[in-house]
Amino acid sequence: MKSSTQAVLEHTAIPKHIAVIMDGNGRWAKKRFLPRIMGHKRGLDALENMVKHCAKLGVQYLTVFAFSTENWRRPEDEVSFLMGLFLQALQKQVRRLHENNMRLKILGSRERFNRQILKGIEEAEALTANNTGLTLSIAADYGGRWDILQAANKLIAEGVSEITEDTLAKYLMLGDAPEPDLFIRTGGETRISNFLLWQMAYAELYFTDILWPDFDGKALDDAVASFQKRERRFGRTSEQLPIEQQRN
């Protein structure tokens, strides 16, 4: 009997870039009468598994929303724990990424991070900068509107007189990375919550009730299988699509 991963690989192309809002850590913990921080710890485990499975499938870019600009409003003890977990991941998990030829990038403002976290970010990005495997981008203290504004301000500061879509895109946090093909949100909510607003213009959206700590390889396979069944026309008619895409 074939595994779910093998079944996915026998269909059409795997999405080159997957973006994820990892929602549901707190609710996962609450259902088990555990403190919220335990949900975040299990969420980190789920991310590790997601990275491994994406690499196995052949996904080239994985971008996850870890901490938004709005998340600073959460209880102080929870924010403190999240920052500590972030630093722990930078210090320990980055070695595994590097050993597997994966690159790590951190997207977002760095103004509110302490020196220890900033140092961890710089060292992690430098260590993996030349790796050529999967690129894992973690959005931390990030917001889609903020991203567009910071890009516009950089263009103004550099005196760019004419701004095109391509020009603006290069100044966004994702830089030269391709736009996401597939967006996944766990936890049952059906909105994009200020995440990659510009870059997700043509992404296929996939929402699931599964809470993030429970999102495993099979759940990812199901999301990719759903993506592969969709007809991505980008404004064209079905008849204008390549023959290979029409067959799928």
Swiss-Prot record:
Binding site for Mg(2+): D23, E204
UniProt keyword annotations, A-Z: Magnesium, Metal-binding, Transferase
Gene Ontology CC annotation, any one: cytosol
Cofactor: Mg(2+)
E.C. code: 2.5.1.-
GO terms of molecular function: ditrans,polycis-undecaprenyl-diphosphate synthase [(2E,6E)-farnesyl-diphosphate specific] activity; magnesium ion binding
Highest taxon, organism lineage: Bacteria
Pfam families the UniProt entry points to: Prenyltransf
Keyword Transferase: yes
Subunit details: Homodimer.
Function: Catalyzes the condensation of isopentenyl diphosphate (IPP) with allylic pyrophosphates generating different type of terpenoids.
Name this protein carries in UniProt: Isoprenyl transferase
Natural source organism: Neisseria meningitidis serogroup A / serotype 4A (strain DSM 15465 / Z2491)
